[in-house]
Structures are given as structure tokens and as C-alpha cells.
């Protein structure tokens, strides 16, 4: 910050005293963040000297700046319950050197993000402890349909003396790229049931 002050001038009982600044910066100079000690020395014609000092403290009250990418929406990678997502990680800037940017939530660029919404938050802290954050979301949608394969059609003669036949088969079980899929029979009869003469359609 630019700081102005009245420059001290020493006096003496005899003429010829000279005042000089021995440390610090002159009035009107740009003082750095922190504390600067200004020292002035007055010396008389006989070599006697006296000094005085004062401090100029400049506080960094300006917050750092950080900008996150736009929210990202992506479909899952084939056969995977998630998706690899890449983005440019934000890096904060500040009026003073020494700002540090870290990720406080979420996953790094190039990671496999799970199905659903992940919030990535980044925080930049400057050398004076001022903090600014930004966040964005990565949404991965599961757009892959589950897979199920039924047995081949079955043809069988009726059991002796019955208008039906006992039929067994391996019930199909679906698979999916994500856990939690459930297979149910929505039409027909379960394996080891007596199927009536005619055509019964089993749907899973």
C-alpha cells in the first residue's frame, strides 16, 4: 500500500544538524504487506546523534480469487458403474505471492466418478490466511440397460394321464454394470411347475 507520513526532522541547540533515514521507506512509497520499521537519525555538527523509529504495518485484507469449471454431466462408461471424467483443476490467484490451492471434497481429474452427483470443492488460502472457495458438480448418469438372456423355447409332450407337463428350466438372472439389479418373473410359471397343454409365455 502507498503510505504517506510527515518525515521527521531533528533539531539541535546549534546549527548544522542533519537528519537521514537509515531504515525503511520514504513517505509516498509502496510498503509491502507486513511490518516495516522506519528509523531516522539526526547528527549535529559535533557528531552527536539521536535516532527515532516507528513502524508501518500493511495488512492484506484482499481475498484470493478462484473460479471453478462449469458443472459436468456425463453418461457412464460402457460396462462400468461410473465414468472417467477429466477437467482443468482450478488454481487460485492473489494480490500477494504464496497462495495455495487444495481440493477439499470430490475426486481429482482423471478419476472414475461414481453414478450420481459428486461435488468437487477447491479452496485457495493466501499467505495472510484469507480463504476463498469454489465448487462444481460432476453428475454421472447410468444410461446402460441391464442384460438378460432367456433359455431357448421348450417343447414337451404332456405327462401320462395329465393335460399338462412338469417342466423345469434354469431361470434367467439379469446382470448390469451397476450392483443392485433385481430379476423378477412377470408372466408365465416358475420352473418345476405343471404347464398346461398349449403355449405359455414366460417373461422375466
Residue ranges and their predicted role:
Residues 1-203:
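Proline-threonine-serine-rich low-complexity tracts
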Amino acid at each position: 500500500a502507498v503510505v504517506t507520513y510527515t518525515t521527521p526532522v531533528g533539531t539541535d541547540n546549534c546549527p548544522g544538524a542533519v537528519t537521514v533515514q537509515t531504515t525503511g521507506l520514504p513517505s509516498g512509497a509502496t510498503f509491502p504487506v507486513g511490518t516495516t520499521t522506519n528509523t531516522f537519525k539526526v547528527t549535529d555538527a559535533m557528531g552527536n546523534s539521536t535516532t527515532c523509529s516507528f513502524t508501518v504495518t500493511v495488512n492484506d485484507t484482499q481475498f484470493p480469487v478462484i473460479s471453478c469449471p462449469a458443472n459436468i454431466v456425463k453418461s457412464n462408461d460402457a460396462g462400468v458403474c461410473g465414468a472417467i471424467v477429466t477437467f482443468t483443476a482450478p488454481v487460485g490467484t492473489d494480490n500477494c505471492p504464496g497462495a495455495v490451492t487444495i481440493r477439499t471434497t470430490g475426486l481429482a481429474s482423471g478419476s472414475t466418478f461414481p453414478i450420481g452427483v459428486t461435488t468437487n470443492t477447491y479452496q485457495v488460502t493466501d499467505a495472510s490466511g484469507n480463504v476463498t472457495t469454489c465448487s462444481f458438480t460432476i453428475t454421472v448418469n447410468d444410461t446402460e440397460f441391464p442384460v438378460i438372456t432367456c433359455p431357448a423355447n421348450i417343447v414337451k409332450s404332456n405327462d401320462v394321464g395329465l393335460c399338462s407337463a412338469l417342466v423345469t428350466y434354469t431361470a434367467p438372472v439379469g446382470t448390469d454394470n451397476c450392483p443392485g439389479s433385481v430379476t423378477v418373473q412377470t408372466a408365465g410359471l416358475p420352473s418345476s411347475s405343471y404347464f398346461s397343454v398349449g403355449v405359455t409365455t414366460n417373461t422375466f
